[in-house]
């Protein structure tokens, strides 16, 4: 199944992929510097095939989110976006655990969020 897209209250863009059957958890993907959520479509498809829902955020200044491209004035701007998406996920899937994964800069963001 393809990705759905949305925007958070902060105008940050995200993609989501849904498992076709009962999901066991939700994976939140945090991408690296200069990347965007669409680069993780193949990863999301593998997770959804294994009964997981997936969400991926375009960090501020990346992909379809607002801001100067690949520029971050404060590291807190990055963790705030992940926290906002995590809250959104909690409202959509209140009974499922959320697992954060990150690549490169996204790993540090996930560890700090």
Residue ranges of model-derived segments:
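Short coil/turn segments at beta-strand junctions that form active-site/ligand-binding loops
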Residues: 24, 51-52, 95-97
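N-terminal cap/lid segment of alpha/beta-hydrolase-fold proteins
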Residues: 1-21
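Short beta-strand element of the alpha/beta-hydrolase
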Residues: 24-32
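Conserved alpha/beta-hydrolase
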Residues: 39, 44-67
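Alpha/beta-hydrolase fold nucleophile elbow
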Residues: 93-104
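Catalytic nucleophile-loop/oxyanion-hole region of alpha/beta-hydrolase
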Residues: 34-37, 63-89, 93
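Active-site signature of alpha/beta-hydrolase-fold catalytic machinery across serine-
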Residues: 42, 112-113
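Glycine-rich nucleophile elbow surrounding the catalytic serine of serine-hydrolase chemistry
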Residues: 102-112
């Amino acid at each position: 199944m393809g990705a759905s897209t949305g925007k958070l209250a902060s105008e940050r863009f995200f993609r989501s992929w849904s498992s076709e059957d009962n999901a066991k958890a939700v994976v939140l993907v945090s991408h690296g510097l200069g990347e965007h959520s669409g680069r993780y479509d193949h990863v999301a498809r593998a997770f959804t095939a294994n009964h997981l829902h997936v969400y991926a955020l375009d960090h501020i200044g990346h992909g379809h989110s607002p801001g100067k491209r690949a520029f971050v004035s404060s590291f807190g701007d990055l963790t705030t976006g992940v926290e906002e998406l995590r809250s959104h996920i909690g409202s959509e899937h209140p009974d499922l655990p959320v697992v954060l994964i990150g690549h490169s800069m996204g790993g540090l963001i996930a560890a700090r969020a």
